[in-house]
């Protein structure tokens, strides 16, 4: 899957699972890419393997970081604005804190419509906007809803929406 979907052919992508020591893999990386998956499982693994601090250290030193989906969630102060199911509970919800706001990846406004046989039916659950409002009932950190396929470049405490909508 990695070889088929990785768009940057001139950059070799090596999974952390291919290393005997994940800490050393991060410490010696020339770039950090964290893909999608379940944010609870990812956050759990980062804490269990004691990778939060070393990731912060290498990224703050100037090593580039790119996060997609769950990788975007863990770039935030916490993973509290994920859309994922809690399949495992991490010790903490704190994540990398690379930006001073939360991101809700895969954001879309309004209700969802689901294909049902030949037609579509409205999903009557909460919208992402409603969930973000619920988050703000107990938290003051701003949240950016990042639409599918969008890209934010964050550098030197400044962000720019490069592709898509937020």
Q: Where in the sequence are the language-model features?
A:
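N-terminal beta1-alpha1 cap of cysteine-dependent amidohydrolase-like domains
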Residues: 1-31, 35
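Alpha-helix C-terminal capping/helix-to-coil transition sites in glycosyltransferase folds
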Residues: 27-28, 61, 98
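Catalytic nucleophile loop
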Residues: 33-36, 59-78
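Glycine/threonine-rich flexible loop motifs
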Residues: 39-49, 114-117
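Short, active-site-adjacent cap segments at secondary-structure transitions
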Residues: 40, 72-75, 151-153
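Glycine/Thr-rich phosphate-binding loops of Rossmann-like dinucleotide-binding domains
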Residues: 42-43, 76, 83
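Catalytic-core regions built around general acid/base machinery
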Residues: 49-62
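C-terminal and late-domain segments of enzyme folds
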Residues: 81, 85-166
